[in-house]
Amino acid sequence: MDAILNYRPEGSEDYYTLLGCDELSSVEQILAEFKVRALECHPDKHPENSKAVETFQKLQKAKEILSNAESRARYDHWRRSQMSMSFEQWEALADSVKTSMHWAVRSKKDLMLEGSEQTYTNTAQNKERSEQRETKQGDPDSTPEKMMQKESESPEKGISPQNPDSPGLSDWNCGHLHFRWSGDTPSELLRKFRNYEI
């Protein structure tokens, strides 16, 4: 218990910072950063530095954890939970801590750029819209007068809004009627219903 209360996070436990990556980095980016860092601090290049071996081992451990999807998910879960214990302790306690702390985990940070799939669909939709506009602009029948003639020749031509007895008026207008319940005067039936008389 004292170890948890007196825990101070070390910089070497943040594997993303150690490798110079971000939480959203791909495995390829992580491996590329590992290669750069490993070349800088390889023990063979610095035989006089006693910490070179330790640093290189930390880099290898960070690469192994972050390049494996399952261990990376566990590491991200531990990192976002901000638990007062090392990642090794977290792994040793396995499910007991994770079960009781499922609510305390922060969510993954948002992407700064949209996904390529989403961008592609938006671009395709915009192309279709612009093509439709060009077709309408190039169409000689797209003038307002011609459009009115086409509408009058449509199946609803027998229906006129001025003639309420014409067949199909209710069908034609059903999507266009907007009721304002607050402005309507309550009927006797509604009054009885509200007063529990029905």
UniProtKB/Swiss-Prot annotation:
Modified-residue entries (Phosphoserine), positions: 160, 166, 182
Domain J: from-to ranges: 14-79
Gene Ontology CC: one annotated term: cytoplasm
Ranges annotated as biased composition (Basic and acidic residues): 126-156
Domain of life: Eukaryota
Gene3D superfamilies recorded: DnaJ domain
A Pfam family that the UniProt record links to this protein: DnaJ
Residues with PTM N-acetylmethionine: 1
Start and end residues of each stretch annotated as Disordered: 121-183
Localization in the cell: Cytoplasm
Keyword annotations of the record: Acetylation, Chaperone, Cytoplasm, Phosphoprotein
Keyword Chaperone tagged: yes
Assembly information from the UniProt record: Interacts with HSPA8. Interacts with TPH1. Interacts with TPH2.
Chain's role: Probable co-chaperone that participates in the proper folding of biopterin-dependent aromatic amino acid hydroxylases, which include phenylalanine-4-hydroxylase (PAH), tyrosine 3-monooxygenase (TH) and peripheral and neuronal tryptophan hydroxylases (TPH1 and TPH2).
Protein name: DnaJ homolog subfamily C member 12
Species of the source: Rattus norvegicus (Rat)
Source species taxonomy: Eukaryota, Metazoa, Chordata, Craniata, Vertebrata
